[in-house]
Amino acid sequence: MVVGRRGVLGAGLGLGCFAAAGSGGAAALAQGVAGGAPRRLSIQRVQTGETFDDVYWKDGRYDREALRRLDWVFRDPSLDEATPMDPRLFDVLHTMARLLDATGAFQVVSGYRAPETNAARARASRRVSRVSLHMSGMAADVRLPGRDSTAMARLAAEMQVGGVGLYRRDGFVHLDCGPARRW
């Protein structure tokens, strides 16, 4: 399903979920994603097989225990090191799942990366930034089985999220909470 600009605006995301701090982008997304309705995510970590399939937002706020469990699934599996992930990233995934009518779990290829892990990846590939937002818990590389990664990247760009990177060859989309940019 390809969603046009009107569909994204209709979902309450016209402001862009990662607008400048002064504009209340996070609050706008929190209100626009689903109003007061509970927000659910279905996630599978590729490297570990671990899953999260639960509500992470209810009664008008984030569920701290659910966020803690999500942080663990998004951890750096090579070091078993976790960090608090930016919950706006979860809101983006939740919204994308709704707009794509997804029934399966997002597969997380990469979430948080410890600085050592990121440095090793950057040495091995020019495609890895030495100052990656993965190290701040503000980025994830994901795919959604049965959904085209190009369509996912296009939707994320229409949602005006921060960074959106399409890695066609690897079949995933990079999403982050940084400045708006596309590659």
Task: Please place each PLM-identified region on the residue numbering.
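N-terminal secretory signal peptides and thylakoid transit peptides that target proteins
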Residues: 1-19, 23
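C-terminal segment of N-terminal export signals and the immediately downstream linker at the start
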Residues: 20-54
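Catalytic cores and adjacent binding grooves of peptidoglycan-active enzymes
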Residues: 39-44, 127-183
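A mature extracytoplasmic/lumenal domain signature
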Residues: 45-47, 56-58, 110-112, 144-146, ...
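Structured segments of extracytoplasmic/periplasmic soluble domains
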Residues: 46, 73, 92-103, 124-127, ...
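Active-site acidic/histidine clusters and adjacent loop/turn architecture
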Residues: 59-109
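Acidic helix-start/capping segments at beta-turn-to-alpha-helix junctions
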Residues: 105-119
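Charged, often glycine-rich, active-site loop that binds/positions anionic groups
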Residues: 116-132
